[in-house]
Amino acid sequence: MKGLFFSLFTIRDLRGKFLFTLFILFIFRVGSYLPIPGIDPVALRSYFKSQSDFSITNYFDFFSGGAFSNFSIFMLSIGPYISASIIIQLLVYSFPSLKKMQEGEHGKKKIKKYTKYLTIVAAVAQGYATSLYAKSIPGALNIPFYRYIFIAILTVTTGTFILLWFGEQINQKGIGNGVSLIIFSGIVVRLQAALFNLFQSMRDPSQNINPVFVILVLSVFILVVMLIIYEYKAQRRIAIHYARANTKNTVSSYLPIKLNPSGVLPVIFASVLITLPLQILSGFAGVSVLSRQILSYLRPNGFYYTLLNVVLIIGFTYFYSKIQLSPKDISNNIRKNGGTIPGIKADEMEGYLDSIMNRTLFSGSIFLSIIAIIPFLVQNIFRFPYDVSRIMGSSSLLIMVGVALDTLIQIDAYLKTQGLSRRTSKQYAFLQKI
């Protein structure tokens, strides 16, 4: 890994991309501490200190990197955009006319435009809900509520689009996937606080945390990270033979089907899809008994929350993977290029690929589900602090590891395009061996 960091600072273009990415993420972190106009930060700090670790606000705060508890301009993060993307993709998958539209370049631009329109709707809805939540906090507002609600909705909606613009700038001028890195940075900043809370709890006799359990759980943490890396790279290879033109010889190739083709997207989608209704319900918790009951049932790291998270992760794993890898499209492309799968008839190819993908995705989704229940087990069996259990959970671990690997692979690809792959191949050999 020394060679990797050496390349980041010795290759001029790569150094520029790396520093630009850090600069954008730094601005995001600074913005996470800028409160919405009309909010009293002192009243907020006093209120959130009195909240339980299991409160819904701590859950929101975890994925926003502390922006939610500060009621900052970035308190919604990019959640509204991801929610809108999920809805649009479900519609595209359900309606053939939209699917056909997406195939053309003009149609893709229309779909992106619809996604941004829906992002505005989602941001306004979440902004309104968080405004109601702010009203329920004693002394939080230092301006009239009717003025605050307008300012808050406008501010957080603008903040979401600023973050989307940041993500696009990272995609164009930086390193890695911009949106994923923004989520990644929000989780990573909580890592230091989580470790500090763990050591503080170990020193507190009332917490009754056994140091042996700490070593055991941290060992499991390292093991899970290694398994996630393995799962990220694991793939099923299907042999394909292509006939050469004007000859009887064939060329052998293979079709790689990853254990989890959609990467961290199912985890991000599941987290956001849970967060959106909870955020809206939290705004009405002060006036609605039903909202309070639903929020108590879906308490973070509770049984029903964990169960819903597992179901959503499995569902999105299948849904998004089938969008990325359509057995029908793949089989048609193989036939058009004169390819065959040994032992499989041409008209049976689609069914064969579909069955292989279903079995592969089943294994991948079960793996993700097992990791999804880790926070529940760590919190309820070992009684670890909430932040620590969240860091060890599916959402945080998979996002951190997945985004880090994606960024490394993008750096490797960039170096290869610049003719520097021989100098740096040893740095990335570990990725190829996994």
Where are these regions (language model features)?
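N-terminal cationic and glycine-rich segments that engage phosphates or anionic surfaces
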Residues: 1-434
